[in-house]
């Protein structure tokens, strides 16, 4: 599809920032996760702008926005909170990207959805209805200020029965619903297998769409002791043993998977990357972080750190092996922030 307004190519410049988890998971919020506020505080947008960033990805849980017993019935009072986030972004010069981290019938994290987005008609109807609603709601906002990212990390997670072909079918249905309401909206699609591989079934992408990459490689470093707290041995080093250049390791083990998308000119953005802060030594984390940022600079990719607040972020992380700076009553990892600022251009 050719661009049809002056804003259509605004996404072709790079965006750098953070994932904001304000409405990320209703279950976690109800269980006391302090990263999930049930809304998006304006101060986060203000701070990002003060630091020089221009992008916020909002991974959402659909359960905030529809009635529990009727997925087709939106909850206006909750949608207003999303309106506020979009307004915060526009006010502070932060591009907002809306993403469904949990969609009707799919999430890569527990709890399991009662039906499958890829196999059952009801979740697909609810999913496309949500995107149609948001496309109508935000029609007219320039692509430089707002974009959509369809579904977080499609993957062969049991029991949903997802395949690349099945995901492509769902993505096309959602894209059609969006374009019917707002033909010029820029739309991203996450890569297959948790954002690790291009979905070639969706290629070639048109000028109003692109693919979102997620980098948590090597997983044994970024998620050290996350899934197995009793994992023996120290955190693996970075760069890996036998490798003197971490960027080259990432090129061989991560970027090469994306060569088909790079070669066909697809717009790519690193929508998630990060490292769990609890057990990974700070020096290891900073070395890994800088190499991922160098990789992105080499390829001209924008990026969004997972996340701003909490276990993967730079505010109020649970680590105990670094000096924190007091920042408006929060613990700020200044060294990590300085690295991010260094590589945001």
Which role fits each region the language model picked out?
Residues 1-57, 91, 260:
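N-terminal carbohydrate-binding accessory modules
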Residues 3-8, 12-14, 110, 118-247, ...:
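Active-site region of glycoside hydrolase catalytic domains
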Residues 20-40, 68-73, 116-119, 220-250, ...:
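Acidic/histidine-rich helix-loop elements
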Residues 21, 59-62, 100-106, 191-193, ...:
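Short, solvent-exposed turn/loop segments enriched in Gly/Ser/Thr/Pro and often Arg
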Residues 26-34, 62-79, 104-122, 156-159, ...:
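Surface-exposed, active-site-proximal loop segments in enzymatic domains
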Residues 34-39, 64-66, 72-76, 155-158, ...:
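Acidic-and-aromatic substrate-binding clefts and catalytic sites of carbohydrate-active enzymes
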Residues 36-56, 71-102, 106-147, 170-181:
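An active-site-proximal structural segment forming one wall of the substrate-binding cleft
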Residues 281-345:
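Aromatic-rich peripheral "rim/lid" segments of glycoside hydrolase catalytic domains that contact
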């Amino acid at each position: 599809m050719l661009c049809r307004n002056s804003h259509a190519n605004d996404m072709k410049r790079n965006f750098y920032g953070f994932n904001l988890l304000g409405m990320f998971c209703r279950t976690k919020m109800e269980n006391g996760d302090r990263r999930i506020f049930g809304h998006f505080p304006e101060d986060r947008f203000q701070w990002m702008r003060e630091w020089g960033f221009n992008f916020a990805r909002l991974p959402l849980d659909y359960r905030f926005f529809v009635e529990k017993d009727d997925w087709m019935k939106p909850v206006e009072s909750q949608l207003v909170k999303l309106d506020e986030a979009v307004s915060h972004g526009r006010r502070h010069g932060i591009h907002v990207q809306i993403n469904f981290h949990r969609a009707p019938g799919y999430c890569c994290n527990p709890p399991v959805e009662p039906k499958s987005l890829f196999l059952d008609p009801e979740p697909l109807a609810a999913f496309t209805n949500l995107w149609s609603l948001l496309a109508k709601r935000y029609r007219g906002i320039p692509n430089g200020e707002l974009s959509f990212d369809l579904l977080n990390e499609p993957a062969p997670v049991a029991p949903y029965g997802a395949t690349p072909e099945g995901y492509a079918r769902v993505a096309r249905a959602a894209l059609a619903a969006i374009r019917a309401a707002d033909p010029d909206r820029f739309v991203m699609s996450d890569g297959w297998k948790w954002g690790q591989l291009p979905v070639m079934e969706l290629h070639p992408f048109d000028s109003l769409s692109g693919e979102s990459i997620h980098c948590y490689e090597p997983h044994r470093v970024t998620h050290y002791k996350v899934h197995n707290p009793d994992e023996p041995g120290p955190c693996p080093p970075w760069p890996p043993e036998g490798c003197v250049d971490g960027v080259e390791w990432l090129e061989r083990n991560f970027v090469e998977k994306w060569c088909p998308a790079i070669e066909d000119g697809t717009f790519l953005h690193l929508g998630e990357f990060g490292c769990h802060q609890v057990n990974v030594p700070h020096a290891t984390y900073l070395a890994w972080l800088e190499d991922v940022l160098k990789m992105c600079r080499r390829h001209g990719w924008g990026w969004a750190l997972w996340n701003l607040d909490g276990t993967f972020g730079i505010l109020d992380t649970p680590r105990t092996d670094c000096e924190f700076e007091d920042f408006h009553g929060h613990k700020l990892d200044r060294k990590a922030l300085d690295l991010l600022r260094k590589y945001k251009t």
